[in-house]
Regions:
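Short, low-complexity interaction segments enriched in Ser/Thr/Pro/Gly
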Residues: 1-2, 39
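Sec-dependent N-terminal signal peptides of Gram-positive bacterial secreted proteins and lipoproteins
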Residues: 2-28
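Acidic, metal/ion-coordinating pockets
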Residues: 28, 32-414
Length: 414
């Protein structure tokens, strides 16, 4: 299995990336306190919790008191340390495989009112919602990034006047771990549906599950944090921001100096600064943007403008969500932009969907291939084959001039 780590860092903490060292802790053993914590910060370690049960995904954990821990040792031997309330895995020896895969999926929700297919998960488990090939694509990714389009909370109150407000019980976050989720993207227009309480519950829940999140946080430094995915000596930075609710006082609050919320990109100045900052520390930088107009098959004026700005800032790939439908692919000054992955596990209608698989060459750090894998959301999610697969690829090709998409979904600039 590929050895990897994900580090979530603020600008100040990112300067410590080079100090991350390898840890070697046998399964079932305890790390000496405070040495694990000293990997990243000098704060005194409080405790090391040992997690003896099986874990379904690399970053899933179960612990009695995760909030007070400095480190957790999972049954697989993976050590997670903390920096500013986030779980961090230590860098390990390079794997013999010289490529890593990052899979992006679009909108997901586990609320049965908005996604009736999720009722299957409540009765039979999340695995029953995906066919074998789709499940293998998700769990087989070295890094899986999902757009988590709702808060995990039993509290809070719905945003007054907002037409659609969603929430799911905190325990359902376990399903993210079972799916193999490595990063939950929270910069969207629903994470704040149940106000500050709902947002804070979401952050606590994901911390407890050991699932890193980006795009929202307890304050602006937290919300702006970059995820640094490190494997085989290669670092890929991932940023997440939203422009949705394009008005001065949006329902979804922007994070402040001392208040929770999302990382907004209505004005891309700060996001572009974060891209440039990330490129100083990482080999590649990917932006996952929540943008666009619902139900439009191609990008709108704002996406066009912002894609240009993000590309000029140094983004190597831009991936989008929010429109609830698949949108076109375009190259902007040589930078691939997949404007919208659409709904993935969201909504009641049968809908074409899919995932974007990014393959990174770690010998000469670069994106070696981009593949769109067509899928169908209907009674769960299944991978398309034959004529239906080709139909979706043909439709994507028809709205993506300047791009060549082959029969397997691999695409390149014409």
């Amino acid at each position: 299995m590929l050895k990897k780590k994900i580090t979530l860092m603020s600008a100040a903490a990112a300067a410590l990336v080079g100090a991350v060292a390898a840890l070697s802790v046998p399964i079932g053993a305890s790390a000496e306190s405070p040495s694990a914590q000293e990997i990243m910060v000098k704060a005194a370690a409080e405790a090391v919790l040992e997690c003896g049960e099986s874990v379904a995904a690399e970053f899933r954990k179960r612990a009695m008191d995760p909030g007070g821990a400095s480190a957790i040792i999972t049954a697989s031997g993976k050590v997670l340390t903390r920096d500013d309330g986030k779980w961090i895995t230590p860098e390990q020896e390079p794997d013999s495989d010289r490529e890593i895969s990052i899979v992006f999926v679009g909108d997901i929700i586990f609320e049965t009112g908005q996604n009736p297919w999720s009722s299957i998960a409540y009765s039979d488990g999340i695995r029953a919602c995906f066919d074998d090939e789709t499940w293998g694509t998700l769990t087989g990714a070295d890094f899986l990034v999902v757009n988590n389009e709702f808060p995990y909370t039993d509290g809070g109150t719905p945003t007054p006047g907002k037409t659609f407000t969603f929430r799911c019980a905190p325990w359902t976050a376990e399903w993210l771990g079972e799916m193999g989720t490595d990063i939950a993207a929270l910069a969207n227009n629903h994470v704040y549906d149940y106000g500050e309480e709902g947002a804070l519950d979401t952050f606590d829940t994901l911390d407890e599950q050991g699932i890193p999140y980006i795009g929202a946080g307890r304050n602006i430094d937290d919300a702006e944090q970059t995820a640094y995915c490190i494997a085989n000596g290669t670092t890929v930075a991932i940023l997440n921001a939203t422009e949705i609710e394009r008005y001065e006082n949006p329902d979804t609050r922007e994070a402040g100096e001392d208040s929770p919320g999302v990382f907004r990109m209505l004005d891309t100045t700060r996001l572009c600064e974060k891209i440039r900052e990330a490129k100083e520390k990482a080999d590649l930088c990917i932006v996952y943007a929540h943008w666009g107009t619902e139900k439009m098959p191609s990008q709108d004026w704002s996406q066009t403008t912002k894609a240009q700005e993000l590309a000029e800032a140094g983004a190597d790939l831009i991936v989008g969500s929010h429109p609830h439908v698949l949108q076109n692919i375009e190259y902007v000054d040589g930078v691939p932009v997949f404007y919208s992955l659409g709904n993935y596990f969201f909504g009641a209608a049968a809908r074409d969907t899919g995932v974007l698989r990014v393959t990174v060459n770690t010998e000469n750090p670069s994106i070696s291939s981009l593949q769109f894998i067509p899928m169908l959301q209907y009674r769960g999610v299944s991978t398309m084959e034959g004529s239906e697969k080709q139909r979706v690829l043909d439709e994507m090709q028809s709205v993506s001039p300047g791009v060549v998409i082959d029969e397997d979904g691999y695409f390149t600039q014409e």
